[in-house]
From Swiss-Prot:
Protein name per Swiss-Prot or TrEMBL: Dihydroxy-acid dehydratase
Lineage, highest ranks first: Bacteria, Bacillati, Bacillota, Bacilli, Lactobacillales
Catalytic residues of the enzyme: S485
Names of required cofactors: [2Fe-2S] cluster; Mg(2+)
GO BP of this protein: isoleucine biosynthetic process; L-valine biosynthetic process
Catalytic activity: (2R)-2,3-dihydroxy-3-methylbutanoate = 3-methyl-2-oxobutanoate + H2O; (2R,3R)-2,3-dihydroxy-3-methylpentanoate = (S)-3-methyl-2-oxopentanoate + H2O
Pathway membership, UniProt: Amino-acid biosynthesis; L-isoleucine biosynthesis; L-isoleucine from 2-oxobutanoate: step 3/4; Amino-acid biosynthesis; L-valine biosynthesis; L-valine from pyruvate: step 3/4
Enzyme Commission code(s) on record: 4.2.1.9
The UniProt record lists the keyword Amino-acid biosynthesis: yes
Binding note for cofactor: Binds 1 [2Fe-2S] cluster per subunit. This cluster acts as a Lewis acid cofactor.
Gene that this polypeptide is encoded by: ilvD
PROSITE patterns: ILVD_EDD_1, ILVD_EDD_2
Origin species: Lactococcus lactis subsp. lactis (strain IL1403)
Modified-residue entries (N6-carboxylysine), positions: K137
């Protein structure tokens, strides 16, 4: 791949940060430390590239990132004038933590990742950053950290997993989640239940549908912070290896041209990222994370920007969880650049946005394959969309005065009016499914699990999967002040603001109340009189905080509401 920059370039020192330590004669102890890690005399004038991965053994999404990091370090070290230094930060496996109290730490991990990248690179004076994320919150955490530093940076996505298979049926992580509901209702044998569990995840790579990891990887490539094809190159592929080999030259180009995240992450670039989320049918979590990433670089993106773009952007990708295909299938027909090329041709993207190649988005995809709509149905043309407008809708009303996020594919309809069934937390809901408390026509209300109330705003993938598995996915709706996984589908509304513990009306809903959700007029309402609401509010007792010490308590104290991306650094 060729790298270039069309702007005017002044003479730039590649080591303008690291020279603070390596070239200062009053820093002898610092320089002794460098000799201690193996520096040679010639290394002291090189630009230092911090290479951070979220590698750890305990998650398929992340288990291979150390290997990719080593390959990237080799690429950097083979590039004249650069030296790579690896470091690591944490992650949380959403697939493992989902359904239990550990899931409260997932969103929190985004902030920990961002803070740790900023902290390490800021203290060590790295001249550039390469981040290698795998699981969901890894991606925005990496971008937020790099944006705060505002030094030449590239994100290398760890890549998507291959599908699993059992008895001739293709499987993925959501197959395992939904098998629980099938088991509860007696719709799957013990043998097949175990067979699904054993075969859903065949190895390394992020969850394979258009779930949160793949959604964000696609959004970030479109934003311009990854090399072309990074989001669609599978974890186990020659293309992913070749991508790592290119990083040395790519990061040197950014250093030479002094191209920083602030040059790339513009308002128009974020609009491109939101557009691709809609086109691919991506995760609701993109709303939270894109707002947070924009905040980190000083660009104002709000929920209403998502609605504005949703109104003019169709869903064209037939991807799981609501569709048929996985990210590996997109790779086979030309990857994300093929989609971007088509959207640019149709006038749906800002083609002049700068990217980490030093070229514009339009220049990056000039040689990409053209989508052939006659030979595949993974991606549809604009004239035959899966849904004429975006699937992510921002709903307001007395239940969500600060807004909420609905994921409406169109297959479940766009209007739901039903009877409330209230659950104070995730386990309460699962108990309700097992006891038969939920019936067709009900609106499940799961509350007290927002950013403050959770704390940490856990995902409700286990409840929505149980609902689908129990055969109620098309006849019930679910609303919450928590989040949803990218694997969630059905008639669902999350991110309700204000949340229950912050005075939101969702905290006052009672069983048998009528709730109306209108995704055409973008409203969500509790059909209870003002007098009754006032009476309930007068009698309301705020729940005792679930965390009083540690990182969860810190998050609850610092976080902004979901409508502002749950950022903690304002």
């Amino acid at each position: 791949m060729e790298f270039k920059y069309n702007g005017k370039v002044e003479s730039v020192e590649l080591n303008k940060y690291s020279k603070t330590l390596t070239q200062d004669p009053t820093q002898p102890a610092t320089q002794a430390m460098y000799y201690g890690i193996g520096f040679k005399d010639e290394d002291f004038k090189k630009a230092q590239v911090g290479i951070v991965s979220m590698d750890w053994d305990g998650n398929p999404c992340n288990m291979h990132l150390g290997t990719l990091g080593s390959k990237i370090k080799s690429s950097v070290n083979q590039t004249d004038g650069l030296i790579g230094l690896q470091f690591h930060t944490i992650g949380v496996s959403d697939g493992i933590a989902n359904g239990k109290l550990g899931m409260r730490y997932s969103l929190v991990s985004r902030e920990v990742i961002a803070d740790s990248i900023e902290t390490n690179a800021g203290a060590e004076y790295y001249d550039a950053i390469v981040a290698i994320p795998g699981c969901d919150k890894n991606m925005p955490g990496s971008i937020i950290g790099m944006a705060r530093l505002n030094r030449p940076s590239i994100m290398v996505y760890g890549g998507t997993i291959e599908h699993g298979e059992y008895k001739g049926e293709k499987l993925n992580i959501v197959s395992a989640f939904e098998s629980l509901g099938q088991k509860i209702t007696g719709n799957i044998s013990d043998e097949d239940y175990h067979g699904v569990i054993c075969n859903a995840i065949p190895g390394q790579g992020a969850c394979g549908g258009m779930y949160t990891a793949n959604t964000l990887a696609a959004a970030i490539e479109t934003l311009g912070m990854s090399l072309p094809y990074s989001s669609s190159n599978p974890a186990v592929s020659q293309e992913k290896q070749e991508e790592c080999d290119e990083i040395g030259l790519a990061i040197k180009n950014l250093l030479e041209k002094d191209i920083k995240p602030s040059d790339i992450m513009t308002k128009e670039a974020f609009e491109n990222a939101i557009t691709i989320v809609m086109v691919l049918g991506g995760s609701t979590n993109a709303v939270l994370h894109i707002i947070a990433m924009a905040n980190a670089i000083g660009v104002e993106i709000t929920q209403d920007d998502f609605q504005r773009i949703s109104d003019i952007t169709p869903v064209l990708g037939d991807f799981k969880p609501s569709g048929k295909y996985m990210m590996e299938d997109l790779h086979k027909i030309g990857g994300l650049p093929a989609v971007l090329k088509y959207l640019l041709k149709e006038g749906k993207l800002h083609g002049d946005c700068l990217t980490v190649t030093g070229k514009t988005l339009a220049e990056n995809v000039e040689t990409a394959l053209d989508l052939d709509f006659d030979s595949q149905d993974i991606m549809r043309p604009l004239k035959n969309p899966i849904k004429a407008t975006g699937h992510l809708q921002i709903l307001y009303g007395n239940l969500a005065q600060g807004g909420s996020v609905a994921k409406i594919s169109g297959k479940e309809g766009e209007f739901f009016k039903g009877t409330a069934r209230v659950f104070d937390g995730e386990q309460h809901f699962i108990d309700g499914i097992e006891s038969g408390r939920l019936h067709a026509g009900d609106v499940a209300v799961i509350r007290n699990i927002g950013p403050v109330g959770g704390p940490g705003m856990p995902e409700m993938l286990k409840p929505t999967s149980a609902l689908i598995g129990a055969g109620l996915g098309k006849s019930c709706a679910l609303i919450t002040d928590g989040r949803f996984s990218g694997g969630t589908h059905g008639f669902v509304v999350g991110h309700i603001v204000p949340e229950a513990v912050e005075g939101g009306l969702i905290g006052l809903v009672e069983d048998d109340d009528i709730i109306e959700i209108d995704a055409v007029n973008n409203s969500i309402s509790l059909k209870v009189s003002d007098e009754e609401i006032a009476k309930r509010r007068a009698n309301y007792q705020k729940p005792t905080p679930k965390a009083t010490r540690g990182v969860l308590a810190k998050f609850a104290k610092l976080t902004r509401p979901a409508s502002e991306g749950c950022v903690t650094d304002l």
